[in-house]
Amino acid sequence: MARAIVLRQLTASPKSRLQLERKLAERNVPEDVAAAVLDRFAEVRLVDDAEFADMWVRSRSQSRRLARGALRRELADKGIDADTAASALGQLSDEDEEAAARHLVERKLRAGTDLSDRAERDKATRRLASMLARKGYQPSQAFRIVAEVLDAAAAGAPAGEDSGEDPADWE
């Protein structure tokens, strides 16, 4: 029964060992049986927290454009230890993270916002920096990127032009 539960869970989507342990506990599988089944799945590499963490970071950083801080929290919630999480997060460069943040801000910047009006600019800054903070970006980085994008938008130039980035790399 425990093996069938684990297989069904892994068929739906990749899972960490802790997620599978929790699911087995929900189904009242004895701990020793759960441990034995999960150990066997780990031996045949069907349960591999390092591989799960790598996949999770790749997927979430591309689809949701989350920063390392948010990804680290998500991995911890899924039972991934700090060393494994750090290794998985190593695949994200500072440049990738900054480009993702810049792309988010440019996409969320409302067309028609009057950036010459100080109150409107402050409102846009707060809204965009808060959005980046919710995605795990550091406040200093968030405010810097928002200011750069707003300055570029106020000047009428796409923000990617003055940053030396190729907009084709943003997607």
What residue ranges belong to the model's regions?
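An alpha-helical, amphipathic repeat domain used for nucleic-acid recognition
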Residues: 1-171
